[in-house]
Protein backbone atom coordinates (compact mmCIF):
# COMPACT_ATOMS: atom_id res chain seq x y z
CA UNK A 1 0.00 0.00 0.00
CA UNK A 2 1.23 3.46 -0.90
CA UNK A 3 -0.25 6.65 0.52
CA UNK A 4 0.59 10.05 -0.93
CA UNK A 5 0.60 12.97 1.52
CA UNK A 6 0.88 16.15 -0.57
CA UNK A 7 1.74 19.66 0.58
CA UNK A 8 -0.76 22.50 0.70
CA UNK A 9 -0.08 23.88 -2.77
CA UNK A 10 1.83 20.90 -4.11
CA UNK A 11 -0.71 18.31 -5.16
CA UNK A 12 -0.20 14.69 -6.20
CA UNK A 13 -0.15 15.54 -9.91
CA UNK A 14 2.90 17.82 -9.61
CA UNK A 15 6.24 16.37 -10.82
CA UNK A 16 7.84 15.08 -7.62
CA UNK A 17 4.77 13.25 -6.34
CA UNK A 18 3.62 12.22 -9.83
CA UNK A 19 6.92 10.53 -10.65
CA UNK A 20 7.45 9.35 -7.08
CA UNK A 21 4.15 7.48 -7.37
CA UNK A 22 5.15 5.97 -10.74
CA UNK A 23 8.47 4.77 -9.27
CA UNK A 24 6.64 3.22 -6.31
CA UNK A 25 4.16 1.45 -8.62
CA UNK A 26 7.12 0.15 -10.63
CA UNK A 27 8.45 -1.29 -7.36
CA UNK A 28 5.24 -3.16 -6.56
CA UNK A 29 3.20 -0.62 -4.60
CA UNK A 30 0.11 -0.97 -6.78
CA UNK A 31 -2.56 -0.07 -4.21
CA UNK A 32 -2.49 3.71 -3.85
CA UNK A 33 -4.39 6.29 -1.85
CA UNK A 34 -3.71 9.88 -2.90
CA UNK A 35 -4.79 12.25 -0.17
CA UNK A 36 -6.25 15.62 -1.03
CA UNK A 37 -6.75 18.38 1.46
CA UNK A 38 -7.12 22.12 1.49
CA UNK A 39 -6.31 24.99 3.78
CA UNK A 40 -7.17 28.64 3.27
CA UNK A 41 -4.93 30.12 5.97
CA UNK A 42 -2.56 32.93 5.12
CA UNK A 43 0.92 33.97 6.29
CA UNK A 44 2.06 30.45 7.16
CA UNK A 45 5.77 30.76 6.49
CA UNK A 46 7.66 31.52 9.69
CA UNK A 47 4.43 31.74 11.68
CA UNK A 48 4.44 28.88 14.19
CA UNK A 49 0.84 29.41 15.36
CA UNK A 50 -0.54 29.48 11.80
CA UNK A 51 1.54 26.45 10.81
CA UNK A 52 0.15 24.55 13.79
CA UNK A 53 -3.40 25.48 12.77
CA UNK A 54 -2.68 24.34 9.23
CA UNK A 55 -1.17 21.07 10.46
CA UNK A 56 -4.17 20.34 12.71
CA UNK A 57 -6.65 21.04 9.91
CA UNK A 58 -4.77 19.01 7.30
CA UNK A 59 -4.07 16.16 9.72
CA UNK A 60 -7.77 15.92 10.54
CA UNK A 61 -8.61 15.81 6.81
CA UNK A 62 -6.03 13.08 6.24
CA UNK A 63 -7.32 11.07 9.19
CA UNK A 64 -10.87 11.18 7.81
CA UNK A 65 -9.70 10.03 4.37
CA UNK A 66 -7.72 7.16 5.87
CA UNK A 67 -10.50 6.07 8.21
CA UNK A 68 -11.32 2.45 7.49
CA UNK A 69 -8.03 1.58 5.78
CA UNK A 70 -7.01 -1.84 7.09
CA UNK A 71 -3.25 -1.38 7.27
CA UNK A 72 -2.76 -4.85 8.77
CA UNK A 73 -3.80 -6.40 5.44
CA UNK A 74 -0.60 -5.15 3.80
CA UNK A 75 2.87 -6.66 4.04
CA UNK A 76 4.51 -3.39 3.04
CA UNK A 77 3.32 0.16 3.49
CA UNK A 78 4.89 3.24 1.95
CA UNK A 79 4.14 6.85 2.85
CA UNK A 80 5.28 9.29 0.16
CA UNK A 81 5.06 12.88 1.33
CA UNK A 82 5.87 16.47 0.44
CA UNK A 83 6.33 19.56 2.63
CA UNK A 84 3.74 19.74 5.44
CA UNK A 85 2.59 16.32 4.23
CA UNK A 86 5.83 14.93 5.67
CA UNK A 87 4.76 16.06 9.13
CA UNK A 88 1.28 14.61 8.64
CA UNK A 89 2.68 11.27 7.42
CA UNK A 90 5.12 10.96 10.33
CA UNK A 91 2.48 11.97 12.89
CA UNK A 92 -0.08 9.54 11.44
CA UNK A 93 2.37 6.62 11.39
CA UNK A 94 3.33 7.36 15.00
CA UNK A 95 -0.23 7.76 16.30
CA UNK A 96 -1.44 4.53 14.69
CA UNK A 97 1.81 2.56 15.14
CA UNK A 98 2.11 1.91 11.42
CA UNK A 99 5.38 0.31 10.39
CA UNK A 100 6.13 1.81 7.02
CA UNK A 101 8.79 3.18 4.77
CA UNK A 102 8.83 6.95 4.36
CA UNK A 103 9.87 9.13 1.47
CA UNK A 104 10.14 12.76 2.52
CA UNK A 105 10.30 15.29 -0.29
CA UNK A 106 11.27 18.70 1.18
CA UNK A 107 10.47 17.83 4.80
CA UNK A 108 9.85 20.38 7.52
CA UNK A 109 11.81 20.25 10.78
CA UNK A 110 8.66 19.18 12.69
CA UNK A 111 8.63 15.93 10.71
CA UNK A 112 11.50 14.61 12.79
CA UNK A 113 9.74 15.16 16.12
CA UNK A 114 7.92 11.86 15.47
CA UNK A 115 11.09 9.71 15.59
CA UNK A 116 10.94 8.26 12.10
CA UNK A 117 12.66 4.88 11.88
CA UNK A 118 12.73 4.08 8.16
CA UNK A 119 12.98 6.58 5.35
CA UNK A 120 14.80 8.78 2.90
CA UNK A 121 14.66 12.56 2.47
CA UNK A 122 15.36 15.21 -0.16
CA UNK A 123 15.75 18.96 0.36
CA UNK A 124 17.00 22.04 -1.45
CA UNK A 125 19.49 24.40 0.20
CA UNK A 126 17.36 27.38 -0.86
CA UNK A 127 14.11 26.03 0.58
CA UNK A 128 12.41 29.01 2.25
CA UNK A 129 9.83 26.80 3.99
CA UNK A 130 12.28 24.58 5.86
CA UNK A 131 15.03 25.25 8.35
CA UNK A 132 17.40 23.40 6.05
CA UNK A 133 20.27 23.00 8.53
CA UNK A 134 17.89 21.72 11.21
CA UNK A 135 16.28 19.27 8.78
CA UNK A 136 19.67 17.94 7.67
CA UNK A 137 20.84 17.57 11.29
CA UNK A 138 17.61 15.85 12.41
CA UNK A 139 17.65 13.52 9.42
CA UNK A 140 21.22 12.45 10.09
CA UNK A 141 20.56 12.08 13.82
CA UNK A 142 17.69 9.67 13.05
CA UNK A 143 19.82 7.90 10.42
CA UNK A 144 17.49 8.91 7.60
CA UNK A 145 19.58 9.40 4.44
CA UNK A 146 19.05 12.94 3.16
CA UNK A 147 20.00 14.25 -0.26
CA UNK A 148 20.66 17.97 -0.52
CA UNK A 149 20.40 20.00 -3.74
CA UNK A 150 22.51 23.15 -3.71
CA UNK A 151 20.42 25.77 -5.51
CA UNK A 152 17.01 24.10 -5.22
CA UNK A 153 13.93 25.60 -3.58
CA UNK A 154 10.89 24.01 -1.90
CA UNK A 155 9.85 22.38 -5.20
CA UNK A 156 13.43 21.13 -5.69
CA UNK A 157 13.69 23.58 -8.56
CA UNK A 158 16.32 26.21 -9.40
CA UNK A 159 14.60 28.21 -12.11
CA UNK A 160 16.85 26.62 -14.74
CA UNK A 161 14.66 24.07 -16.54
CA UNK A 162 17.40 21.65 -17.62
CA UNK A 163 18.96 21.72 -14.14
CA UNK A 164 15.49 21.16 -12.63
CA UNK A 165 15.00 18.10 -14.84
CA UNK A 166 18.43 16.79 -13.81
CA UNK A 167 17.47 17.21 -10.14
CA UNK A 168 14.11 15.49 -10.70
CA UNK A 169 15.86 12.61 -12.46
CA UNK A 170 18.40 12.28 -9.64
CA UNK A 171 15.65 12.34 -7.00
CA UNK A 172 13.72 9.63 -8.83
CA UNK A 173 16.82 7.45 -9.29
CA UNK A 174 17.50 7.69 -5.55
CA UNK A 175 13.81 7.04 -4.79
CA UNK A 176 13.94 3.94 -7.00
CA UNK A 177 17.16 2.74 -5.38
CA UNK A 178 15.60 3.13 -1.93
CA UNK A 179 12.46 1.22 -2.91
CA UNK A 180 14.29 -1.56 -4.72
CA UNK A 181 16.27 -2.50 -1.60
CA UNK A 182 14.69 -4.84 0.94
CA UNK A 183 13.07 -3.13 3.92
CA UNK A 184 15.33 -3.02 7.00
Q: What kind of region is each of these model predictions?
A:
Residues 1-73:
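Serine-hydrolase catalytic machinery in alpha/beta-hydrolase-like enzymes
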Residues 131-144:
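Conserved loop-alpha-helix segment in the C-terminal half of the alpha/beta-hydrolase fold
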Residues 59-66, 160-184:
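Catalytic active-site module of serine/aspartate enzymes centered on a nucleophile-bearing elbow/loop
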Residues 121-123, 127:
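Short beta-strand/loop motif that positions the catalytic acidic residue
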Residues 97-109, 117-118:
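A conserved short beta-strand
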Residues 45-46, 152-167:
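Catalytic histidine-centered segment of alpha/beta-hydrolase-like enzymes
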Residues 77-90:
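Gly/Ala-rich beta-loop-alpha elbow adjacent to hydrolase catalytic centers
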